[in-house]
Amino acid sequence: LLMPVKPNDDRVIGCWCISRGYLCGCMPCKLNDDSLCGRKG
């Protein structure tokens, strides 16, 4: 099993880097999707 890798960008909250995007909980989302990824504005 592949373990989730936390991004080096601490502006991201509760997200893990999955290939080209983030996985927030069980919901895949785009890197630039602030609402789904919970990024700090």
From Swiss-Prot:
Keywords, comma-separated and alphabetical: Disulfide bond, Protease inhibitor, Serine protease inhibitor
Signal peptide: none
Residues of the site described as Interaction with trypsin: R20, K30
Domain of life the protein comes from: Eukaryota
Listed GO MF terms: serine-type endopeptidase inhibitor activity
Cystine pairings recorded for this chain: C15-C26, C17-C24, C29-C37
Function: Has two active sites that simultaneously bind and inhibit trypsin.
The protein, known as: Trypsin inhibitor
Higher taxonomy: Eukaryota, Viridiplantae, Streptophyta, Embryophyta, Tracheophyta
